[in-house]
């Protein structure tokens, strides 16, 4: 997928990118590839793959959650890595207010430089573990309209990291690959324990490669119990599962 095909593929979903936005994506690609030579940000570095599997893929939540397109939502991106999905969403929909949390300082430094070079405003970054960022004494707890995560962990783990950040009436959006149906079944208990309810599981395929993808949308129905998230590392080692 080259930049023109990227533009056309999004236009099919009624997302129209301006020349400025396309230039921002082009610069994003250059900065990503250049920095990746210094330390590992991604294994995907060829332009067609970056545009498809990073940029296009990051924008797919807007296909199924229309409010992302025109509402000034506050979004927390948990474990954003090289900025996915939040930076592509911010480029395409500038009204979004983005907060990024990542545990590796090198990635945060890259993101700070990226935001400056792209001329983006309304983006904050935090070097922190998701477990402490969403802790019971954190000012960020239950303060965001949306929490997003892409390929960070299984849904049973992700929900413990993300749902405590989402305000009542807000949503968690998980971007998943082929095994999402199994994850959804396994993760339902954790989602419910954390005050959420799975309301959408949208299955689709990426253009060109037909790689399977899922967008899972979870509504925040009630407060997350203060005992969650547990201490750093525990959610991954001991995911919340239904008692046998």
UniProtKB/Swiss-Prot annotation:
Q: Which GO terms describe its molecular function?
A: rRNA (guanine-N7-)-methyltransferase activity
Task: Please tell me whether the keyword Cytoplasm is annotated for this protein.
Answer: yes
Q: What are the alphabetically sorted keywords of the record?
A: Cytoplasm, Methyltransferase, rRNA processing, S-adenosyl-L-methionine, Transferase
S-S pairs: none
Query: What general EC class does the enzyme of this chain belong to?
Result: transferase
Q: What segment(s) does the record annotate as region Disordered? A: 221-244
Annotated Gene Ontology cellular component terms: cytosol
SUPFAM superfamilies recorded: S-adenosyl-L-methionine-dependent methyltransferases
Q: Which ranges of the sequence are coiled-coil?
A: none
EC numbers, comma separated:
2.1.1.-
Q: Where in the cell is it found?
A: Cytoplasm
Q: Give me the residues that bind S-adenosyl-L-methionine, please.
A: 79, 84, 130-131, 150
Name the family.
Belongs to the methyltransferase superfamily. RNA methyltransferase RsmG family.
Q: What does the function comment of this entry state? A: Specifically methylates the N7 position of a guanine in 16S rRNA.
Protein's recorded name: Ribosomal RNA small subunit methyltransferase G
Organism of provenance: Lactiplantibacillus plantarum (strain ATCC BAA-793 / NCIMB 8826 / WCFS1)
């Amino acid at each position: 997928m080259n930049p023109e095909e990227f533009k056309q593929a999004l236009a099919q979903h009624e997302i129209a990118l301006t020349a400025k936005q396309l230039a921002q994506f082009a610069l994003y690609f250059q900065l990503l590839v250049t920095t990746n030579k210094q330390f590992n940000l991604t294994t995907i570095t060829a332009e067609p793959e970056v545009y498809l599997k990073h940029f296009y893929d990051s924008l797919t939540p807007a296909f199924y959650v229309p409010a992302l397109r025109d509402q000034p939502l506050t979004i927390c991106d948990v474990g954003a890595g090289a900025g996915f999905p939040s930076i592509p969403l911010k480029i395409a929909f500038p009204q979004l207010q983005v907060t990024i949390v990542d545990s590796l300082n090198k990635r945060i430094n890259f993101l700070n430089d990226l935001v400056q070079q792209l001329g983006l405003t309304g983006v904050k970054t935090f070097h922190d573990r998701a477990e402490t960022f969403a802790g019971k004494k954190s000012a960020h707890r239950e303060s965001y309209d949306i929490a997003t995560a892409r390929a960070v962990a299984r849904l049973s783990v992700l929900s413990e990291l993300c749902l405590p950040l989402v305000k009542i009436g807000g949503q968690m959006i998980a971007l998943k690959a082929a095994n999402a149906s199994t994850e959804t079944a396994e993760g339902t208990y954790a989602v419910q324990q954390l005050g959420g309810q799975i309301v959408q599981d949208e299955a689709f395929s990426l253009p060109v490669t037909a790689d399977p993808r899922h967008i899972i949308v979870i509504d925040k129905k009630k407060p997350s119990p203060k005992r969650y998230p547990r201490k750093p590392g525990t959610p991954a080692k001991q995911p919340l599962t239904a008692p046998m």
